[in-house]
UniProtKB/Swiss-Prot annotation:
<dbReference type="InterPro" id="IPR036565">
    <property type="entry name" value="Mur-like_cat_sf"/>
</dbReference>
<keyword id="KW-0132">Cell division</keyword>
<keyword id="KW-0961">Cell wall biogenesis/degradation</keyword>
<dbReference type="Pfam" id="PF01225">
    <property type="entry name" value="Mur_ligase"/>
</dbReference>
<keyword id="KW-0067">ATP-binding</keyword>
<dbReference type="InterPro" id="IPR013221">
    <property type="entry name" value="Mur_ligase_cen"/>
</dbReference>
<dbReference type="GO" id="GO:0071555">
    <property type="term" value="P:cell wall organization"/>
</dbReference>
<dbReference type="Pfam" id="PF08245">
    <property type="entry name" value="Mur_ligase_M"/>
</dbReference>
<keyword id="KW-0436">Ligase</keyword>
<protein>
    <recommendedName>
        <fullName>UDP-N-acetylmuramate--L-alanine ligase</fullName>
        <ecNumber>6.3.2.8</ecNumber>
    </recommendedName>
</protein>
<dbReference type="Pfam" id="PF02875">
    <property type="entry name" value="Mur_ligase_C"/>
</dbReference>
<dbReference type="InterPro" id="IPR050061">
    <property type="entry name" value="MurCDEF_pg_biosynth"/>
</dbReference>
<dbReference type="GO" id="GO:0005737">
    <property type="term" value="C:cytoplasm"/>
</dbReference>
<comment type="similarity">
    <text>Belongs to the MurCDEF family.</text>
</comment>
<comment type="pathway">
    <text>Cell wall biogenesis; peptidoglycan biosynthesis.</text>
</comment>
<dbReference type="InterPro" id="IPR005758">
    <property type="entry name" value="UDP-N-AcMur_Ala_ligase_MurC"/>
</dbReference>
<dbReference type="GO" id="GO:0051301">
    <property type="term" value="P:cell division"/>
</dbReference>
Length: 451
């Protein structure tokens, strides 16, 4: 990749990964972001020049400009590049270009769990095949990075359905974790349009193998809609109708145990990640690795080393009002993700009271899923609800934090992190476990608990 490439919005997790990948594949790389952060510092340590002011960038020196979804079309650097006739590519479009440097690519998509599933597959393949690489939307704990380039053989990528940009990609293998109602503005608020986009993705000529979770209604709807016979389509899940069935799920000493029935063989596995949803995610990766020809024992040994991705069920021990308390930091921000996480906490800590501290993310999501929130938020023993993280949106009347808990009793409404800590200091003891959850800045609350 002998090109000069400027990455705009390089302080974000997705674009930073592409910048590193491009550099390791031989490109001359520079980046721009309006503010320096840990990711830009990492890029600078790798020898990538980072600009924080548009005035310092000579756009004419670059062959390609790659930009994140956070970069507006009116941004001066993007506008200048277009006026100069420089090729400008949205993040997913450049990922499609990057994929061409690899012999074989595996894409993970779905409304929930794609980052975790990508991290599981990346961790497995990096142990099973030293020439495997990955570019995912979170920090893979096994590698302490969101990117690894170990040659140009196999590439694991996270394919984003939220903006339909996965349609730019042409992988050989597709894993679909689930299909649910989120980011529906992308699909004109039409479930059928959403399904059609997934159908278009798996129908690409490059795709040879497709793995879908048959426990999920959306995946079942896709299976009913998709009727091409020229691809290897495998369903997996706890359902007796799955091609690869999961069974004997249980937890011993905080380790998840389960078995799968694969082509007539009963195979047992252990996993550090909690919850049935993570067993489903891991099973998709196991099947893909088995179908690639890797040995069961090698996969089994590699799986127990999988530790997931940052901010997905991260475990901490905090001292709160003199009590040692388990605190879990999690990125979940959709009713399905909330319900799955609370179920996983319940499975792992069956004798403890669950205190759920939740920060809703986006008023539009609150509004669009208003009927689904109360059931999910009722599953913990105690709910502490924070103000909604706006992510730049204007307040929508009837879609604020108290509105998504309509009909619930006994929950506590905190006006900020300090107020939430006040509640936790009154409620927490050795018999409680605290789940702090949301896609905004609520992770900062975890650090505040140690102060």
């Amino acid at each position: 990749m002998n090109k000069k490439i400027l990455f705009l919005g390089v302080g974000g997790i997705g674009v930073s990964a592409l910048a590193i990948a491009a550099k390791r594949l031989g490109a001359h790389v520079a980046g721009y972001d309006s503010a320096a952060n840990k990711l830009t510092a990492k890029l600078e340590a790798l020898g990538i020049v980072i600009f924080t002011s548009p005035s310092g960038v000579d756009v004419a020196n670059f062959d390609i400009v790659v930009y994140s979804s956070a970069i507006l079309s009116s941004h001066p650097l993007l506008s200048q590049a277009r006026s100069l006739g420089i090729q400008c590519l949205q993040r997913a479009m450049f990922l499609a270009v990057l994929m061409k440097d690899f012999s074989y690519s595996l894409a993970i998509t779905g409304t929930h769990g794609k980052t975790t599933t990508s991290s599981v597959l990346a961790t497995l393949l990096c142990q099973l095949d030293k020439h495997s690489s990955f570019v995912v939307g979170g920090v893979v704990k096994y590698a302490d990075s969101n990117i690894q380039v170990n040659g140009t053989d196999k590439l694991v990528i996270e394919a984003d359905e939220s903006d339909a940009s996965f349609l730019f990609l042409s992988p050989q293998v597709v894993i679909i974790t689930n299909i649910d109602l989120d980011h529906m503005a992308t699909y004109n608020n039409s479930y059928q349009t959403l399904l059609e986009n997934f159908t278009d993705f798996v129908s690409k000529e490059s795709v040879k193998s497709i793995y879908l979770c048959v426990d999920d209604q959306g995946c079942r709807d896709l299976l009913a809609k998709y009727n091409q016979s020229d691809k290897n389509v495998t369903s997996y899940g706890f359902s007796i109708n799955a091609d690869v069935q999961i069974y004997d799920y249980h937890i011993i000493d905080e380790i998840t145990h389960f078995k799968i029935r694969y082509k007539g063989d009963d195979l047992s596995f252990k996993l550090q990640l909690p919850g049935k949803y993570n067993v489903q995610n891991a099973t998709a990766c196991i099947i893909a690795c088995l179908d690639l020809g890797f040995k069961y024992e090698d996969i089994r040994n590699a799986l127990i080393k999988v530790t997931g991705v940052a901010r997905r069920f991260d475990l901490y021990t905090k001292v709160i009002s003199g009590h040692q308390v388990t605190v879990i930091d999690d990125y979940g921000h959709h009713p399905v993700e909330v319900a799955n996480s609370i179920s996983a906490v319940r499975d792992r800590y069956p004798n403890k009271k669950i205190i759920h501290v939740f920060q809703p993310h986006r008023y539009t999501r609150n509004r669009d899923l208003i009927k689904d929130w109360p059931k999910a938020l009722s599953l913990a023993d105690q709910l502490i609800l924070l103000p909604t993280y706006s992510a730049g949106e204007q307040i929508i009347k009837g879609a604020e934090s108290q509105d998504i808990a309509k009909g619930l009793s006994g929950y506590l409404l905190a006006d900020g992190f300090d107020h939430a800590i006040y509640f936790l200091e009154k409620l927490a003891n050795e018999n409680t476990v605290i789940l702090i959850q949301g896609a905004g800045d609520v992770t900062n609350l975890v650090e505040m608990l140690s102060e």
